[in-house]
Amino acid sequence: VIERIVPAGTETAEAYGDLPEATLFPEEELIVKSAVAKRRGEFTTARHCARQALTRLGAPAGAILTGERGAPQWPEGVVGSITHCDGYRAAVVARPALVTSIGIDAEPALPLPSGVLDAVALADEQVAVKELLASVPQVPWDRLLFSAKESVYKAWFPLMRRFLEFEGARLVFDPAGGTFTAHLLAGPAIAGSRTLHTFDGRWLSENGIVLTSVTVPA
């Protein structure tokens, strides 16, 4: 389903559980050598998905190490994003001629634990979430907001190389259109010669998972 919220011309792969054929390169093994089995399984299958997507793109499908703040290190000439949560793993990759930066995030379609919304949402976002929960209760809008902010960060970091706090972007959802706009309160993002004050995102809630994406087109 991830292909429904990313641009045409990108390549994706996804899995709804850990795959027995998924393996890691020795360099990747070092990243999760101390991880619990659940985390290791998610990481391994997510890397497997990433290599599937890279192969479809015609790019080298070797080890994908982690760089600053855990961001995946893609082969030269590739931009992409990886996500994994309970019951879902996915990756998307693209060529820089099409996409400057992209972020995806998956979360279980469940309400956030008590207190988390207060920690991640601005006051007006909290009001909007409560209104959306009342009008469209089948979507866990609090969890969707959290996911969307993760996607915003994943698209922001490769451009700016610095952390973006949750309060650094204000999100506005279109519940009917499956889209959202992120207003960059922490300052604009610089994408080549462009100065971006907003990011555009897409979302869906399906099969017990909420998915979000943010794409900065080339």
Please describe what each predicted stretch is.
Residues 1-218:
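Core catalytic alpha/beta fold that binds nucleotide/phospho-ligands
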